[in-house]
Regions:
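Hydrophobic, helix-rich cores of sensory/ligand-binding and other regulatory modules
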Residues: 1-128
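Conserved small/polar residues in nucleotide/adenosyl-binding loops
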Residues: 148-150
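Short alpha-helical interdomain "coupling" segment at the junction between an upstream regulatory sensor module
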Residues: 128-135
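Short, leucine-enriched amphipathic alpha-helices that occur as contiguous helical runs
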Residues: 137-142
Length: 150
């Protein structure tokens, strides 16, 4: 069966099973809260364990552990880009991203990945909180500095 036929069959089955993904607004609001350094909001979301709630979560793998790993990597990548866009120095953001993905590789359970997810989100958020509340430099200056290789 070619991929187009497989895709159409998959789409039909999803439609018939009434499978619906979570609304993108909640996800974008969460990433924005991190990028804006809103620690309390991010902590609340982490406490709700929304990351591991299977309702509305896409299926990136039929293996539950692999599925959460893939979602984790996507989450880290998006948070990294949101934070860079809001003023986190690019190299620092990518180093944080790499660090947390490598740490996730060591996790053996969904629970370990979930805990690491919360730590990672709050770490990025705290970096952004410091930038937003103590930044003397404009976003444009931070961008220029990230382009200068010393």
């Amino acid at each position: 069966m070619d991929l187009t036929k497989k895709w159409h069959r998959s789409e039909f089955v999803s439609h018939e099973m009434l499978e619906v993904h979570r609304g993108i607004e909640c996800e974008l609001d969460f990433y924005s809260a991190i990028a804006n350094g809103e620690i309390e909001l991010v902590q609340e979301n982490c406490n709700e364990q929304a990351f591991t709630n299977p309702e509305g979560m896409g299926v990136l793998s039929t293996d539950a552990l692999r599925n959460i790993r893939y979602h984790y990597v996507v989450t880290v990548a998006l948070i990294t880009r949101f934070c860079v866009h809001e003023g986190l120095e690019q190299e620092k953001a990518y180093n944080l991203s790499d660090f947390y993905i490598l740490e996730m590789d060591k996790c053996k359970t969904i629970e370990q990945i979930s805990k690491l997810h919360d730590v990672m989100c709050l770490d990025f958020c705290k970096h952004m909180h410091e930038i937003k509340n103590g930044q003397v430099l404009s976003k444009q200056v931070v961008l220029c500095l990230s382009l200068i290789h010393i």
